[in-house]
A protein has these predicted regions:
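Thiamine diphosphate
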Residues: 1-90
Length: 90
């Protein structure tokens, strides 16, 4: 998505209808974050039977460390996104 608001629900729905899979990654806290809204909206719109896998990747619900090495441990990384994508298609 290029924008968070308004977000292109039609584009996400078209992709989800084609693949049956949804992966939302963002740096905000995963619980109650934008990714949860995207997944919930798509489930409401397409129905759970049409979604094979829906995953969210976000920050854990903990304070963000000041130390860069510790911060890097909890950040959403390309490796974490790839791992979640592989799990979604397994």
């Amino acid at each position: 998505l290029r924008t968070i608001w308004p977000w292109d629900q039609d584009a996400v729905a078209a992709s989800l209808e084609k693949t049956g899979r949804l992966l939302v990654a963002h740096e905000a806290v995963e619980v109650g974050g934008f990714g949860a809204e995207v997944v919930a909206t798509m489930v409401d719109r397409l129905g759970p039977a049409n979604i094979k896998a829906a995953r969210r990747i976000g920050a854990p619900r903990i304070p963000i460390p000041f130390s860069p090495p510790l911060e890097n441990e909890i950040r959403v990384t390309p490796a974490k996104i790839v791992a979640a994508a592989k799990a979604a298609i397994a």
